[in-house]
């Protein structure tokens, strides 16, 4: 899936998002180029060797090919998420008024910013949960069918342990990612939780219906103090609201609509 969707996205950058690509090509192009030259070739070459190497390569070498493909996939994920993290939180760049483009000033600062690191950890944790579930599910099916019970029993145990460890990692990284979002993208968090006004403490929305213009809630079912606890790790922490941030951004950047599509974000 990584290889197939990556090929499609290469065309989308030029055809669907050409203006964006011209504006940030110097920045997003750097990690994507490394991903294409290093990670993509690593995973595609060794995945091919693994597929066509059955009964042709020595067993240890054949095993090494799928490990290298997996490493390539994780490297690929990191470089792609680094480019996405710049879109979420631009850093290590300068604007060139002569070319009307942004230019990269520090590749490693952009590559290893906090947003990229925690997003990668969160994504990989979810990937391991998926992998563990697939292994555990197939193993359970084999046990029920009575096929290779000894192997299936051990792989079921491995898959179950992977799910538990990855789930704990997913919860921790998700919490860390949310707190980084509150600092770097407060409007995104406010929209995701349908918090229209700055609150301290801030409630966690279970279900909210808002007006069509996205200016206020009509009905809301909340958990008191919940969002403050998630966003600040305190029961009475302040979380900025959509309307307050809209007014702040208008004063800072000029008139305009700085709200995301609230129903979709929520």
Regions found by a protein language model. Give the residues of each.
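Polytopic transmembrane helical bundles with strong interfacial aromatic enrichment
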Residues: 1-266
């Amino acid at each position: 899936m990584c290889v197939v969707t990556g090929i499609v996205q290469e065309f989308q950058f030029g055809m669907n998002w050409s203006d964006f690509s011209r504006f940030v090509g110097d920045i997003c192009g750097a990690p994507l180029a490394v991903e294409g030259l290093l990670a993509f070739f690593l995973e595609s070459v060794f995945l091919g060797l693994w597929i066509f190497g059955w009964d042709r390569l020595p067993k240890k070498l054949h095993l090494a090919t799928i490990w290298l493909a997996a490493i390539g996939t994780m490297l690929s994920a990191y470089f792609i998420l680094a480019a996405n993290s710049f879109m979420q939180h631009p850093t290590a760049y300068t604007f060139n008024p002569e070319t009307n483009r942004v230019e990269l000033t520090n590749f490693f600062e952009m590559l290893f910013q906090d947003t990229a690191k925690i997003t990668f950890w969160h994504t990989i944790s979810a990937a391991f949960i998926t992998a563990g579930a697939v292994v555990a599910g197939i193993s359970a099916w084999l046990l029920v069918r009575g096929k290779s019970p000894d192997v299936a029993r051990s792989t079921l145990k491995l898959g179950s342990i992977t799910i538990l460890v990855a789930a704990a990692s997913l919860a921790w990284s998700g919490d860390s990612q949310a707190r980084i979002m509150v600092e770097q993208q407060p409007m995104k968090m406010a929209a995701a939780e349908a918090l229209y006004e700055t609150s301290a403490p801030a409630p966690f929305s279970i279900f909210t219906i808002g007006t069509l213009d996205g200016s206020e809630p009509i009905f809301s079912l909340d958990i008191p103090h919940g969002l403050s606890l998630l966003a600040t790790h305190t029961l009475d922490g302040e979380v900025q609201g959509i309307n307050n941030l809209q007014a702040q951004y208008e004063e800072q950047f000029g008139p305009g609509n700085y709200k995301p599509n609230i129903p979709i974000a929520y």
